[in-house]
Design a protein with these regions (language model features):
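C-terminal accessory extensions appended to soluble enzyme cores
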Residues: 169, 174-246
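Glycine-rich phosphate-binding P-loop
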Residues: 1-7
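A conserved mid-domain beta-alpha-beta active-site/ligand-binding segment of alpha/beta enzyme cores
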Residues: 127-202
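Noncatalytic linker/hinge segments flanking ATPase motor cores
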Residues: 57-61, 111-123, 145-155
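A generic structural signal for well-ordered alpha-helical segments
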Residues: 8-10, 99
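ATP-dependent NMP and nucleoside kinases share a basic, alpha-helical "lid"
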Residues: 77-140
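Conserved nucleotide-sensing/catalytic segment adjacent to the nucleotide-binding pocket
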Residues: 10-86
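Well-ordered, non-membrane alpha-helical segments in soluble/globular domains
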Residues: 45-60, 86-95, 134-145, 175-176
Length: 246
């Protein structure tokens, strides 16, 4: 992601970014968390739902307000577990044509087995000893493990892999099949990754020339209220549990 940003800036593009962790953080206020505390698999479903709704609307607003052809927007969209998975779902709103357009590309990296193991080790290290303020808010290593278990379970449920494979350790084939399903409504490119650039610094160091989209307190209040009016907690939970059905 950082390399993409760096290259884009060097080519004269004005880059904006929307990241799940930063977008979600705006919704994790003391008052909201008191009402909707974390659950066993992470952030409360209603908060995830609200953050995703804000994300699509923020993108729609950016597209409307941005007229300079040198501007571009990059999204960090984890998807697994309903983390900005709204961006891959075909929805009847004003931003869907742009998301489905050939001008929008969803890039998903596929690490090799050995690289995946190294990434897990790096996450354990940065989580235990954060060297950047945002690393302290990174998901714990157990979230990476949960994401893989979810990938296998949902891939098996969809018939993409066998039941026996659903208990497999990380396997590139499973990862690719699942993401091909998730991104079937999007212009998607797979990139195989087998190298870690050890001197690349923190993944959160984006550079001074990158502008980040964040939800304002008023936006947070409005979106939370809208989701509360439209869904009970049980309904929001069921909706979030179906994040992989696109």
């Amino acid at each position: 992601l950082r390399q993409q940003l760096s290259i884009s800036v060097s080519l004269g593009r004005r880059v904006h970014i929307m990241r799940w962790d930063k977008g979600l953080a705006a919704f994790q206020t003391e008052d909201i968390l008191a009402k909707y505390p974390d659950v066993s698999d992470g952030t409360h479903p209603l908060i995830r739902k609200a953050a995703g709704l804000w994300g699509r609307r923020a993108l729609a607003r950016w597209l409307t307000e941005t007229t300079n052809p040198t501007d571009m927007i990059v999204g960090e969209v984890p998807i697994i577990g309903n983390r900005f998975s709204e961006f891959i779902q075909a929805q009847p709103d004003q931003v869907e044509p742009a998301l489905a357009s050939e001008e929008t590309t969803f890039i998903y990296p596929v690490p090799t087995k050995s690289l995946r193991a190294n990434l897990e080790a790096i996450r354990r290290s940065t989580f235990a000893n954060p060297k950047h303020p945002d690393e302290a808010r990174d998901a714990p290593p157990s979230t990476m493990e949960l994401a893989w278990r979810l990938t296998c379970a949902k891939a098996a449920e969809l018939g993409l892999i066998s039941e026996a494979d659903s208990h497999s350790p990380y396997e590139e084939m499973i990862y690719v099949r699942f993401f091909e399903h998730l991104l079937q409504h999007r212009n998607a490119i797979r990139i195989g990754v087998d190298t870690i650039y050890s001197n690349a610094g923190s993944a959160h160091d984006l550079g001074a020339n990158v502008l980040e989209l964040n939800a304002s307190p008023d936006e947070v209040r409005c979106v939370i209220a809208e989701v509360e009016a439209a869904f009970t907690v049980e309904e929001a939970t069921r909706d979030v549990e179906n994040w992989y059905r696109v």
